[in-house]
């Protein structure tokens, strides 16, 4: 009986000490509603799609021609654009009209660009299907370029499967990508910009949005999914 009494006393003491300790735990002042992991997982009501789901949607279809934008779609190329702005027009965006900048960007500064994982995954998926992959960029064309080289190396594209990068250029009031997309009979086009989705819509082909990284030099960020297009999940990197 004495052992039982001592045991119960020990338990009671432990509980009382634990309660006292709990009562003394300091908690900071609550200053915001906070968020749970479940709440973080809630997405906007748009058409999210994964690479695997895109691949599944193409099952049974013959090989086709597909296209990709480059900057912020398959390459994070902001380092070069950031450098160009600082060097040629720190107070505005006139550097984008400067031929000297484009000579640098198209021939040297892509060595600082990082391939996006979503670009690698999508391109490899299409190559596995036997699709022909084209890259159409809004960059200004230059006499020479190494963009094709860096895209091929960064996305692990075999030399015999790599098409030369198409430089559509950027003219106010015109979407220069449309004619190239039409000429190459694209069935799908991936891009981060509203103009990419608009070009696909104009040709009535499947336009799929890639998320632009939040730290991209190309601001403001577009509203992905606003046109009802599919948006690739986790495609910001």
Curated annotation (Swiss-Prot):
Note on how the cofactor is bound: Binds 1 Mg(2+) ion per subunit.
Molecular function terms, GO-annotated: acid phosphatase activity; metal ion binding
Localization terms from the record: Periplasm
Binding positions (substrate): 137-138, 177
Annotated GO CC locations: outer membrane-bounded periplasmic space
Any Pfam family: Acid_phosphat_B
CC cofactor: Mg(2+)
InterPro entries named in the record: Acid_phosphat_B-like, HAD-like_sf, HAD-SF_ppase_IIIB_AphA, HAD_sf
Protein keywords: Hydrolase, Magnesium, Metal-binding, Periplasm, Signal
EC category name: hydrolase
Source species, domain of life: Bacteria
Active site per the UniProt annotation: 69, 71
EC number: 3.1.3.2
Coiled-coil portions: none
Catalyzed reactions per annotation: a phosphate monoester + H2O = an alcohol + phosphate
Chief place of localization: periplasm
Amino-acid positions noted as binding Mg(2+) in the UniProt annotation, renumbered to this chain: 69, 71, 192
Region forming the signal peptide: 1-23
Function: Dephosphorylates several organic phosphate monoesters. Also has a phosphotransferase activity catalyzing the transfer of low-energy phosphate groups from organic phosphate monoesters to free hydroxyl groups of various organic compounds.
Oligomeric and partner information: Homotetramer.
Record family assignment: Belongs to the class B bacterial acid phosphatase family.
Official protein name in the record: Class B acid phosphatase
Organism encoding this protein: Proteus mirabilis (strain HI4320)
